[in-house]
Regions:
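Conformational coupling and interaction surfaces
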Residues: 2-4, 18-24, 28-29, 163-170, ...
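Active-site histidine-anchored catalytic micro-motif
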Residues: 2-46, 50, 91-191
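Generic structural signal for helix capping and beta-alpha/helix-loop junctions
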Residues: 39, 69-71, 192-194
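Metal-dependent C-N hydrolase catalytic cores
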Residues: 45-115, 265-266, 275-294, 298
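Proline-centered flexible-loop/turn and helix-kink motifs
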Residues: 57, 115, 136, 180, ...
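A residue-level signal for conserved active-site and pocket-lining positions in enzyme catalytic cores
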Residues: 61, 175, 243
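Short, well-ordered secondary-structure micro-motifs
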Residues: 72-75, 132, 156-157, 195-198
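Short, surface-exposed amphipathic charged segments that create phosphate/polyanion-binding patches used
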Residues: 74-82, 158-162, 200-202
């Protein structure tokens, strides 16, 4: 039985790599929602749509939350992703895509959960949190894969939080309270997977397709940033690693835990005493994940 996914994306470079890998791996992408994060939400939706279309996927893309639950000001530009989330290679937002709250309402995500569609969330959890506020019963014991958390490494958010949690910590807290039971794939794990620059370069040299050339344009500054942050010659495709966790769960090890927001470090997650409310990925077969992602991306 093929994997069916609802995907939530904030339109960055690693989101694009994740979408391509999923579309080329036989996954049935049932629906996609966009959220603010690496760029503003309309741009994130446009990025997702053009990546999927160039990958041969016709899934509908909906425009979700443009700001977090607390409505804090959002800075659109992120180092490594650029103003449009794709370092100038993003889709055109001139075509207005349908909003998530019409015609389905945020019930679109609840419907996915009720129908047994798996979830993959690669940005701030605002859309999921809003959906859980309206229909909490739909998400009881749903186990979406969520790219979130930085436990023993530092992320790019204030206090060392990962960017997704830092962007809307209230949303993640709400999701944990709802009983969703997410499978968290933190930076501790995603930072162990490297896709080498040469793999992107060879693909760009061997293929002149618009998709490959756009990805090559997008990954350049992203690789530069990762070289400075993490070392090595390549990038840590954080969201693509989360996608790999949905695709190949046998390559990832999880531990049940009770997690919450650290009150002293804004947006940072910590393990605390209590009944498990999430599963935390603690180990990954990094070399095999890297190999499979490269094969999915470049053939």
């Amino acid at each position: 039985m093929s994997l069916r996914l609802h995907i939530d994306t904030d339109g960055g470079v690693d989101d694009a790599l994740a979408l391509v890998a999923l579309a080329r791996s036989g996954v049935e992408i049932a629906s996609v929602s966009a959220v603010f994060g690496n760029t503003w939400v309309d741009q994130a939706a446009s990025n997702a749509r053009w990546v999927l279309r160039l990958s041969g996927c016709a899934a509908d893309v909906f425009v979700g939350a443009e700001a977090g639950l607390a409505l804090r000001p959002f800075q659109h530009r992120r180092p490594g992703h650029g103003h449009d989330g794709m370092n100038g290679a993003g889709g055109s937002p001139r075509r207005r895509l349908p909003p998530l709250d019409r015609p389905h309402g945020v019930g679109l995500i609840a419907l996915a959960a009720r129908q047994g569609v798996s979830g993959l969330f690669m940005g701030p959890l605002t859309n999921l949190a809003r959906a859980s506020l309206e229909d909490p019963a739909a998400f009881h014991d749903w186990r979406p894969v969520v790219m979130a958390g930085a436990f023993d490494v530092d992320g790019q958010g204030h206090g060392g939080a990962d960017f997704n949690t830092w962007s809307d910590p209230e949303a993640l807290q709400r999701v944990l309270w709802t009983g969703v039971n997410p499978r968290l794939v933190p930076l501790d794990v995603t930072s162990k997977v490297l896709i080498e620059t040469d793999a992107f370069r060879r693909a760009a040299e061997n293929s002149q397709t618009p998709l490959v050339q756009k990805l090559w344009q997008a990954v350049g500054p992203y690789i530069d940033q990762h070289r400075a942050l993490w070392g090595g010659e390549g990038c840590r495709p954080h969201d693509a690693v989360a996608a790999a966790a949905a695709l190949w769960p046998e390559l990832f090890t999880y531990e049940p835990a009770h997690v919450g927001l650290d009150p002293n470090r804004f947006g940072r997650l910590e393990r605390i005493d209590g009944a498990p409310n999430a599963e935390i990925c603690t180990a990954v077969q990094a070399a095999e994940v890297s190999r499979r992602l490269a094969h999915a991306l470049f053939g």
